[in-house]
Amino acid sequence: MIEQIFQMAQGNEFTIEKVIADENVHFNHMILGKNEGLPEHFSNSNVYMTVLRGNLSITLDDQDTHEYPACSLLKIPMGIKMNVRNLGEETLELIVVKAPAPK
C-alpha cells in the first residue's frame, strides 16, 4: 500500500490531536465545546485553519475578535498572536495545517 491512512476522533468531546507531524507539515485536528479554547500563543509557522463545523471565534494580535462559520478557511502568517475559542452554542471542529512544519 503506497498511501498512509490516518484516523481522526469523532464526537463532541474536547480533542487536540496531532494527526501528522513530519518534516514537511503539521496537520492537527481539534474539537472544542462551548466556551473551550486554546491557550493564547504565537503562530510558529504559516497556519491554515479550516472550520469543519460550528463557529470559530479568533482574536489575532490586537484586532477585535472575529467569528467564522463552517467551511471558512483562514490563512494566518507566522509570528501572529492567536486566541482561539468557541464562543458559540455548537461544537467547533477545526483542521489546522502548519506549513512549512515548525522547526
PLM features per residue range, with description:
Residues 18, 27-29, 48, 73-75, ...:
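Conserved hydrophobic/aromatic beta-strand scaffold that supports enzyme active sites
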